Design a protein with these regions (language model features):
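Glycine-rich phosphate-binding loop
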Residues: 68-140, 144-171
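Glycine-rich phosphate/diphosphate-binding loops and the adjacent beta-loop-alpha structural elements
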Residues: 1-7, 11-26, 31, 91-92, ...
Length: 174
C-alpha cells in the first residue's frame, strides 16, 4: 500500500531543561507515533522516526533519530524533510522553552525561582509552509472544543490533514 513512499514521523514528548536535573515536559507516551511508524513500515514505506524520550521498543525497519528538546526535534525534522512524501507530526512538542537555564542544580530556598519562557519554533507550520512540502498531517490534543480547535489548527497551519484527540479527564490521554 505504501511501497515507494518516504515517510517522516515525529513521536513522543520533548524536554526543555531548567537546570542539569530538572526539565519541563508533557505526558506524551509516544505510542501513537510509534504505531504509525510501524504501520507505515509494514505497508512498505521507507520510514524515519524522530523521537523524543520514550520507553518504547524501536519499530522494526524504521530509522529512529533520538532527540530531547524542541529545538533538536526542529533541526532533525528540517534537516530530513526534503524528499519525503508524507510528514506526520505526532509528537507533543513543547510550546515553550526556558530562556536561561542554570548550569548548576538550583537549590531549594525560601524564594521560588522565576522562569522566563520563550516560544519554541513551530515544526508543523514550518514543514507545511515549505515551497515543496510533503503531505502534512498534524495532531491536535485538546481538553475542550475538540472539533473547533482542530479545524482552527488545520487552517492556521495549512495542514493537509489533522487527527484530533480529546485529552484530560479519566478517558482522555496521550
Amino acid at each position: 500500500v505504501m511501497a515507494g513512499l518516504c515517510v517522516l514521523i515525529t513521536a513522543g514528548p520533548t524536554r526543555e531543561p531548567i537546570d542539569p536535573v530538572r526539565y519541563i515536559t508533557n505526558r506524551s507516551s509516544g505510542k501513537m507515533g510509534y504505531e504509525v511508524a510501524r504501520a507505515a513500515a509494514r505497508g512498505g514505506a521507507s520510514v524515519t522516526l524522530v523521537s523524543g524520550p520514550v520507553c518504547l521498543p524501536k519499530p522494526d525497519g524504521v530509522v529512529v533519530v533520538e532527540i530531547e528538546t524542541a529545538d533538536e526535534m526542529y533541526r532533525a525534522v528540517m534537516d530530513r524533510v526534503q524528499g519525503h512524501d508524507i510528514y506526520i507530526g505526532a509528537a507533543a512538542v513543547a510550546d515553550y522553552s526556558v530562556v536561561e537555564t542554570s548550569e548548576r542544580k538550583m537549590k531549594k530556598s525560601d524564594v521560588a525561582p522565576q522562569l522566563l519562557l520563550t516560544l519554541t519554533r513551530d515544526i508543523l507550520a514550518n514543514v507545511a509552509g515549505l515551497e515543496q512540502s510533503p503531505f502534512t498531517v498534524g495532531f491536535a490534543a485538546e481538553t475542550d472544543d475538540l472539533e473547533a480547535n482542530a479545524k482552527q489548527k488545520l487552517a492556521a497551519k495549512k495542514l493537509d490533514m489533522i487527527v484530533a484527540n480529546q485529552v484530560g479527564g479519566e478517558e482522555g490521554g496521550f
